Structures are given as structure tokens and as C-alpha cells.
Curated annotation (Swiss-Prot):
Quaternary structure (record): The cytochrome bc1 complex contains 11 subunits: 3 respiratory subunits (MT-CYB, CYC1 and UQCRFS1), 2 core proteins (UQCRC1 and UQCRC2) and 6 low-molecular weight proteins (UQCRH/QCR6, UQCRB/QCR7, UQCRQ/QCR8, UQCR10/QCR9, UQCR11/QCR10 and a cleavage product of UQCRFS1). This cytochrome bc1 complex then forms a dimer.
Designated name of the protein: Cytochrome b
Organism expressing this protein natively: Orycteropus afer (Aardvark)
Keyword Electron transport: yes
Residues reported in the UniProt entry to bind heme b b566: H97, H196
Principal localisation: mitochondrion
Keyword check for Transmembrane helix: yes
Note: Heme 1 (or BL or b562) is low-potential and absorbs at about 562 nm, and heme 2 (or BH or b566) is high-potential and absorbs at about 566 nm.
Length: 379
């Protein structure tokens, strides 16, 4: 009798995806983050489900319901902080996963890459709407500022913003619909992740050398299941350190003040994982220009396959491109720092220079450097 693992219609799919999957023998720890993102998504859906059982999406009770979860529900504080800090871990894994894709040229699998960009946008939308739900000061003002950006769209902008708000300001209708969307989107993310995996398995995984590895493949299980398990242990350790020792480290203190439309916080800023984009938005002294730069800063990922001028896929043997890549990483860290600072000298000019550098590195310096390296190969 043939193994049920290989014959059963459903188990067969799981087998081909996670057990008998032929995998390059040399993929490094940077390839762990895909599975970690899957784990993060599961953690977020499970903790989110338990939070939704006790949360009320009404402006008069939302803030109190979060307090009730933390004080009265059994281990409610744990569930709430696992969910909040789980989002931070999610984005750390996401940024490393994208960085790995850029470094090793994984973006040349264009279908997988494009689904990944859609996943990034969907995850960012979900996180933004989730941040509004506790209905603290930063929730309310963050929602007001970010949704207001849509009013920069010519002709339809104002109508669009009022349609999203469900009124003339962020209010009950906005909170209710944000809760509904925040609940449904993670399941859409899960479906998209399956499509992402489907496209990846059409081509097989890339590897650190950027070479075709068909001649040297090993089964995913047990080699990479045990490796992913180590990554999972480290992820859980980091998450628990954060949750149990300093759960509010990455949050904003003003979100412990109930939302008040009559008093604006001195510095409105989003969660840390949006600060780089927020800094780019703020560095342009024009509303529409800022919004376009904000969208472009993420959408620029879509043209990476077109900007690939190198003869080698991976940056492993391209030292000049490696230097540029790490300058880009440093630039993004600088933008993240600037996004959390007040709009005053010298932060304004630093933010503007970092924003310009971000686009120059990706659009101009990286393709030119690759061409120079191509020439150096001929020497």
C-alpha cells in the first residue's frame, strides 16, 4: 500500500509543499523568514480572535474594552501584548525577508515577488487599521492624519475621504468599519500567502549563489523543518522577552489617553514600522507630492526586476553592490529615526537628504554599479 502522504488528495499537497519539497542544499538562515512570517500570521490570527471576543468597536466603549481585556480577562494582558508586539515581530521578519530578496536577486521570480508586494501592502493596511482600534489619542489622530492624505487626490479626494470615514470626521462609523476590515484582511493575507507559495514552488527556491541548483537538491523534511524550528524558537524567545519584560517599549504613551478630537498630541506619529515611509512623506513640503513619494517608496519594489542589470543574480560576489545595499539599509534606519522626530531643524534636512538618497540608490546607483561590475568581470 502506497503511503497516504503521497496518495491522499489534500495531504499530497501538504507533502509536496513542506515534506518532499526539493530544496537547494545551501540556503542560509536568511531563508528562514518566510516560515517565520507564516508563524507570525498564525499568532496574530489566534490572539486577534481572542481579543475580538472581548473587544467592542464603538467609540464610547472601545478604549474601556481594551482596559477590560488587560485587567479582567484571564491572561488578557498577555493576549493583548502578544498581539501588539507580534505585529512588530511580523514587520521585522517582513523587512528582513524583503531585504534577503533584494540581496540575493529573488525578485527575478517576478510572480512570487509581485504577490509579495501585494502582501506587503495588505499587511501594512491591516496593521494601520489595527492601530486605530484601541481608540487612544494616537489611534484617533493617526487615523485622521493618514486617511486625510487621500484628500490630496485631485477632484475625488475630499469625497473619497468622507466616504472612508462614513461622515465628516473619524467617528463611530470609521471605527466599526476598520474593525471589520482588520478582522477580514488577515484571512486574505493567508490566502495570498498560499498563492505566494504556489508561485514559488513553480520555480523552486533561489539560493545564496544565485545559481540553478537542480543538480543539488535535498528534501525539505527533516533538514529544513528542523532549521525552521530553531528560527521559530528564537522568534518566540524574542517575542516573549518583549511581551513579558517591556511590552510598551515600541508603543506610544499617548495611546493610554482616550481619544479626544478636541486636543491634538504634540507629535503625531505611526508605529515604528511605518516611520521610514512617514519620514519620506513629511520630507516633501507638498501634500500630493508627499503622498506620491510615500506610495512610490513601497511601489519601487515592483521595478526591481527591471533595474537588474547585473550578469550575476545574487550580490554574493558583487562587493560594490553589497556596499550600496548596506548603505540603503543604513538609510532606511536613518529614515525610521527621523520619522519619530519632531519637524524641526536639523531633522527636516536630514530626512530630505535620506529620502533623496533612498530613491537615488535604488533607481540610479544600483543599476550603474551592476554595469561597472559587469565590466570588471571582463578584466
Amino acid at each position: 500500500m502506497t503511503n497516504i502522504r503521497k496518495t491522499h488528495p489534500l495531504i499530497k499537497i501538504i507533502n509536496h509543499s513542506f515534506i518532499d519539497l526539493p530544496t537547494p542544499s545551501n540556503i542560509s538562515a536568511w531563508w528562514n523568514f518566510g516560515s517565520l512570517l507564516g508563524i507570525c500570521l498564525i499568532i496574530q490570527i489566534v490572539t486577534g480572535l481572542f481579543l475580538a471576543m472581548h473587544y467592542t468597536s464603538d467609540t464610547s466603549t472601545a478604549f474601556s474594552s481594551v482596559t477590560h481585556i488587560c485587567r479582567d480577562v484571564n491572561y488578557g494582558w498577555l493576549i493583548r501584548y502578544l498581539h501588539a508586539n507580534g505585529a512588530s515581530m511580523f514587520f521585522i521578519c517582513l523587512f528582513i525577508h524583503i531585504g534577503r530578496g533584494i540581496y540575493y536577486g529573488s525578485y527575478l521570480y517576478s510572480e512570487t515577488w509581485n504577490i509579495g508586494i501585494i502582501l506587503l501592502f495588505t499587511t501594512m493596511a491591516t496593521a494601520f487599521m489595527g492601530y486605530v482600534l484601541p481608540w487612544g489619542q494616537m489611534s484617533f489622530w493617526g487615523a485622521t492624519v493618514i486617511t486625510n492624505l487621500l484628500s490630496a487626490i485631485p477632484y475625488i479626494g475630499t469625497n473619497l475621504v468622507e466616504w472612508i470615514w462614513g461622515g465628516f470626521s473619524v467617528d463611530k462609523a470609521t471605527l466599526t468599519r476598520f474593525f471589520a476590515f482588520h478582522f477580514i484582511l488577515p484571512f486574505i493575507i493567508a490566502a495570498l500567502a498560499m498563492v505566494h507559495l504556489l508561485f514559488l514552488h513553480e520555480t523552486g527556491s533561489n539560493n545564496p549563489l544565485g545559481l540553478i541548483s537542480d543538480s543539488d537538491k535535498i528534501p525539505f523534511h527533516p533538514y529544513y523543518t528542523i532549521k525552521d524550528l530553531l528560527g521559530l524558537c528564537l522568534l518566540i524567545l524574542l517575542l516573549l522577552l518583549l511581551v513579558l519584560f517591556s511590552p510598551d517599549l515600541l508603543g506610544d504613551p499617548s495611546n493610554y489617553t482616550p481619544a479626544n478630537p478636541l486636543s491634538t498630541p504634540p507629535h503625531i506619529k505611526p508605529e515604528w514600522y511605518f516611520l521610514f515611509a512617514y519620514a519620506i512623506l513629511r520630507s516633501i513640503p507638498n501634500k500630493l507630492g508627499g503622498v506620491l513619494a510615500l506610495v512610490a517608496s513601497i511601489l519601487i519594489l515592483a521595478i526591481f526586476p527591471l533595474l537588474h542589470t547585473a550578469k550575476q543574480r545574487s550580490m554574493t560576489f558583487r562587493p560594490l553592490s553589497q556596499c550600496l545595499f548596506w548603505i540603503l539599509v543604513a538609510d532606511l534606519i536613518t529614515l525610521t529615526w527621523i520619522g519619530g522626530q519632531p519637524v524641526e531643524h536639523p531633522f527636516i534636512i536630514i530626512g530630505q537628504l535620506a529620502s533623496i538618497l533612498y530613491f537615488i540608490i535604488i533607481l540610479i546607483l544600483m543599476p550603474i554599479t551592476s554595469m561597472i561590475e559587469n565590466k570588471m568581470l571582463k578584466w
